[in-house]
Amino acid sequence: MIQQESRLKVADNSGAREVLVIKVLGGSGRRYANIGDVVVATVKDATPGGVVKKGQVVKAVVVRTKRGVRRPDGSYIRFDENACVIIRDDKSPRGTRIFGPVARELRDKDFMKIISLAPEVI
């Protein structure tokens, strides 16, 4: 369950390696984020020369969770880690590459650019 103070791995080449969730967007008392939800986060670890720097506040969309998500057919999809992709305000990714698989649920939430860049959509 992704909530405030959760740390997420960054699954793109924007320069950030790890972020810490500040807020889950979508409602005043919203506590948890799942796949496809947007969070406000701060960069805790970054590569030198990247687009985003350590300490910067960014928006990110959750693309993988350990908790997983239930599909309409009753099956569950789970991943080995909690990961996100840093995005701009228009839902486009800040980086130019996506690493690792992403869930099909992102298509329902209109993150088509992330879907097209991802090496595998599960």
Curated annotation (Swiss-Prot):
CDD domains per the UniProt record, alphabetical: Ribosomal_uL14
Source species: Geobacillus stearothermophilus (Bacillus stearothermophilus)
Subunit structure: Forms a cluster with proteins L3 and L19. In the 70S ribosome, L14 and L19 interact and together make contacts with the 16S rRNA in bridges B5 and B8. Part of the 50S ribosomal subunit.
PANTHER family named among the record's database cross-references: 50S/60S RIBOSOMAL PROTEIN L14/L23, LARGE RIBOSOMAL SUBUNIT PROTEIN UL14M
InterPro entries the record matches: Ribosomal_uL14 (IPR000218), Ribosomal_uL14_bac-type (IPR005745), Ribosomal_uL14_CS (IPR019972), Ribosomal_uL14_sf (IPR036853)
Gene that specifies this protein: rplN
Pfam family, one: Ribosomal_L14
GO (cellular component) term, any one: cytosolic large ribosomal subunit
Molecular function GO labels: large ribosomal subunit rRNA binding; structural constituent of ribosome
Listed name of the protein: Large ribosomal subunit protein uL14
Similarity section: Belongs to the universal ribosomal protein uL14 family.
Sorted UniProt keywords: Ribonucleoprotein, Ribosomal protein, RNA-binding, rRNA-binding
Nucleotide-binding listed as a keyword: no
Task of the protein: Forms part of two intersubunit bridges in the 70S ribosome. Binds to 23S rRNA.
GO biological process entries: translation
